[in-house]
């Protein structure tokens, strides 16, 4: 269930436009994947699950929720010594949440920490995924 809910949430995130019902479905699906990953996954899965909830919340305009789960993703990443890719995306989530409420200081701090994580990511594809998201945020 965890991977299916995670992938379904991504499909909705990638949609050009969402109806109100689809937005609600996306939010519910993000929480479903998180719940299931916390039952069957590893700390890496947990951090990524929290990141996805944060991303969905940010997209839907729930900045407090986005910040809460971005911070949770970072806590799990640090507590379990997770890799730079996961840690970088946790910082990205916090920066994205901060941007939505015009918290320039927090946005800048976590954007820079996410950028710093790029240098520690060995896999080119993973590094490019994070770099693309960070570039997108910088252009806003």
What name fits each language-model region?
Residues 5, 9-12, 29-30, 46, ...:
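TPR repeat positional signature
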Residues 71, 75, 98-122:
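TPR/TPR-like (Sel1-like) alpha-helical repeat modules
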Residues 38-42, 76-83, 119-125:
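Short coil/turn linkers that connect adjacent helices within long alpha-helical scaffolds
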Residues 20-32, 63-71, 110:
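Helix-turn-helix repeat elements of alpha-solenoid scaffolds
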Residues 3-4, 23-24, 44, 85, ...:
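Residue signature of alpha-solenoid helical repeat architecture, marking inter-repeat boundaries
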Residues 7, 52, 86, 93, ...:
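"A position-specific structural signal for the A-helix of alpha-solenoid helical repeats
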Residues 8, 32, 39, 72, ...:
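The canonical alpha-helical register within tetratricopeptide repeats
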């Amino acid at each position: 269930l965890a991977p299916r809910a995670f992938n379904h949430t991504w499909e909705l995130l990638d949609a050009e436009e969402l109806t109100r019902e689809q937005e609600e479905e996306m939010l519910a699906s993000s929480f479903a994947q998180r719940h299931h990953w916390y039952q069957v996954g590893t700390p890496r899965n947990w951090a990524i699950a929290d990141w996805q909830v944060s991303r969905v919340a940010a997209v839907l305009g729930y900045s407090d929720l986005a910040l809460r789960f971005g911070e949770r993703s970072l806590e799990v990443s640090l507590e379990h010594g997770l890799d730079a890719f996961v840690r970088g995306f946790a910082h990205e989530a916090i920066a994205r949440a901060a941007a939505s409420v015009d918290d320039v200081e927090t946005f800048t701090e976590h954007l820079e920490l996410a950028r710093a994580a790029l240098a520690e990511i060995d896999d080119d594809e993973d590094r490019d995924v994070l770099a693309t998201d960070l570039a997108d945020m910088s252009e806003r």
